[in-house]
Regions:
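Alpha/beta-hydrolase superfamily serine-hydrolase fold, recognizing
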Residues: 1-186
Length: 186
């Protein structure tokens, strides 16, 4: 981010605050930066907005792949190991060692009372980022008192493609967050 801010300044666009956002894997990265890296950010992060970004990796949430079943624990460890870059074994699930191993790739595990405000959208028929994982993130933000809005697209898969009204509300809320958390200078 330092390089982005420096290059923008060089081109005549001073950056003195930012919002960060993304979708799918980009949403995962946006959440990680927002919850994990804001203390080191060269400029303040006003809020994060994302859609369908994976935020946690618990086998019981990934039942759409059958990874919640005891006989699939080795497959779950393999998939989550690839996704997080961690060396995982089935016996780690449900332990503090598992959380520690996947923390660098799991935005959920970085949520604190100091997390930035969040606008997020998830889909109940998503086969890429299981909806159950988003419920954990919504709950963590609520439990920590973090201002957030969670939009649920009840007819869509990974792309919010069947819930245009929900998607419109999501985008309108992003605009409201801009006004609230990053108002233009007078």
């Amino acid at each position: 981010m330092d390089a982005v801010v420096a290059e923008a300044a060089k081109l005549g666009y001073p950056v003195n605050e930012m919002a960060i956002g993304g979708g799918s894997a980009g949403g995962c990265l946006a959440l990680l930066y927002a919850y994990r890296d804001t203390a080191e950010s060269p400029v303040p992060v006003g809020f994060v907005f994302e859609a369908v970004g994976p935020s946690s990796f618990y086998p019981e949430d990934w039942d759409n792949y059958g990874l919640d079943k005891p006989e699939a624990q080795a497959e779950a460890a393999g998939l989550f190991g690839v996704m997080t870059g961690a060396k995982l074994t089935p016996d780690m699930f449900g332990t503090p060692a598992y959380d520690a191993a996947v923390k660098d790739a799991s935005a959920l595990l970085w949520v604190t009372k100091d997390a930035v405000p969040t606008v997020m959208a998830y889909c109940t028929h998503d086969t890429m980022q299981p909806f159950k994982a988003s419920v954990r993130l919504d709950r963590a933000l609520t439990e920590n008192g973090v201002p957030h809005d969670c939009f649920v697209a009840e007819h869509s898969g990974h792309g919010l493609q069947n819930d245009s009204a929900v998607y419109r509300q999501y985008l309108e809320t992003v605009l409201e967050y801009l006004k609230t958390y990053m108002p233009p200078e007078s």
